[in-house]
Design a protein with these regions (language model features):
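The feature captures the LRR N-terminal capping module
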Residues: 1-85, 89-93, 99-107, 112-128, ...
Length: 418
């Protein structure tokens, strides 16, 4: 062999051997049948065998398909498979052959079951199955020992398999918008779970084992049918965000006061007074969002550590003078209420940087607002302001004022919208 012969030799890519040489032709025929572009699914065998990412969505194929071919299991180097907003009704058992798969996203299809072989995806880290028709999960789901994120929102699940508790590396679990009536006790075994979303199910109680989720940082419980919370909720020592909206809760357990790392809470208005009584035990609480409000109690002034207060989209017609006691408040959202005036004490909010008053019925603003020396952004859209005297501080950088009728603005030099 001459030196020239050596120069003509080219290294061949490493591929995965397969005993079935016909799989390539069948996979290409399937792709051609449904007009799947070559950019998405190459028609070159060598390229397919080293393919690491396969993304299929409506823009990449002209015809809808309900089934993935069994030959998809031959793509042994695949690390990411994304097929969302399609018409898939089932997965082939061969999906379990994708041993290197790390991400599987099947959001927005018509799946009602999963093959047991999905448990063979030992390297899977993220599984997204939201907006499907799943009524049950296979027991084998518990074999996904490396799974970190499991998204099951908007399905038809009524129960979870006990094996869900075997997902020891799971960090994010989204069960929102299903038909769950109970949770298995095994959920308490998810020791690395950081975020749990249970909103819009049919839960009336939570298992006491939920208190074992010592690494949980965010718990979302919105629009369920909860009547009580377990006292064990107070054991969630790392919880930072708690959402409690749209329930039939008559009271909060006193153990809420043990959540020493809680920074943010969103609750219905009828639970506010109880929460305020617990505030001395919640030193890190900085953000409060309230819903279904018609009045704001004077006790709100006791939340002196608050930095953000969201009172948007309620039915407030007035604010108590005590609002001015929130000396650390940086952002106040009062949009979408029925306010006609503001108390003079609003001028005492020395640290306020952002104020949203849009969508109210304000006809004037208190002169004390010129004392808000740190105010940078103010939204006055959709009110009934006839004019504003020169009372807004020079610190304002953004002023939104559209749809206020005959509004006249007397400002020194704001950066107002035009």
């Amino acid at each position: 062999m001459t030196d020239d012969d050596h120069k003509q030799l080219k290294p061949r890519p490493q591929t995965i051997a397969t005993a079935d040489d016909g799989w390539f032709e069948r996979l290409c025929a399937w792709a051609d049948k449904f007009d799947i572009s070559e950019a998405a699914l190459p028609r070159d065998k060598a390229e397919l065998l080293v393919l690491q990412k396969l993304v299929l969505f409506r823009k990449l194929f002209r015809k809808q398909f309900a089934l993935l071919p069994a030959e998809i299991g031959q793509l042994g180097n695949l690390q990411e498979l994304v097929l969302f907003w399609g018409d898939l009704t089932e997965l082939p058992a061969e999906i379990g052959q994708l041993n290197n798969l790390q991400k599987l996203d099947l959001t927005g299809n018509q799946l009602n079951t999963l093959p047991a072989t999905i448990g063979q995806l030992s390297n899977l880290q993220k599984l997204s199955l939201g907006d499907n028709q799943l009524v049950i999960l296979p027991v084998a789901i518990g074999q996904l020992g490396n799974l970190q994120e499991l998204d099951l929102w908007h399905n038809q699940l009524t129960v979870l398999p006990a094996t869900i508790g075997l997902l020891g590396n799971l960090q994010v679990l989204n069960l929102r918008e299903n038909k769950l009536t109970t949770l298995p006790a095994g959920i308490g075994q998810l020791g690395n779970l950081q975020k749990l979303s249970l909103g819009s199910n049919r839960l009336t109680t939570l298992p006491a084992e939920i208190g074992q989720l010592h690494n949980l940082q965010e718990l979302i419980l919105c629009e369920d049918q909860l009547t009580t919370l377990p006292v064990e909720i107070g054991q969630l020592g790392n919880l930072q965000k708690l959402y409690l909206l749209g329930h039939q809760l008559a009271a909060l357990p006193n153990s809420i006061g043990q959540l020493s790392n809680l920074q943010s809470i969103t609750i219905d208005s009828h639970l506010l007074l109880e929460l305020i009584d617990m505030v001395p035990h919640l030193p890190k609480l900085k953000y409060l969002s309230l819903r279904n409000l018609t009045t704001l109690p004077t006790k709100i002034g006791q939340l002196s550590n608050l930095q953000k207060l969201d009172l948007s989209d309620n039915q407030l017609t007035a604010l108590p003078d005590a609002i001015g006691q929130l000396s650390n408040l940086q952002k106040l959202d009062l949009s979408g209420n029925r306010l006609t005036t503001l108390p003079d004490t609003i001028g005492q909010l020395d640290n306020l940087q952002e104020l949203d008053l849009s969508g109210n019925k304000l006809t004037t603003l208190p002169e004390s607002m010129d004392q808000l020396r740190n105010l940078q952004i103010i939204n006055l859209r959709d009110n009934m302001l006839g004019y504003i005297l020169d009372i807004l501080p020079n610190s304002i950088q953004r002023l939104y004022h559209k749809r206020n009728g005959a509004l006249e603005i007397w400002l020194n030099d704001p950066v107002a919208e035009r």
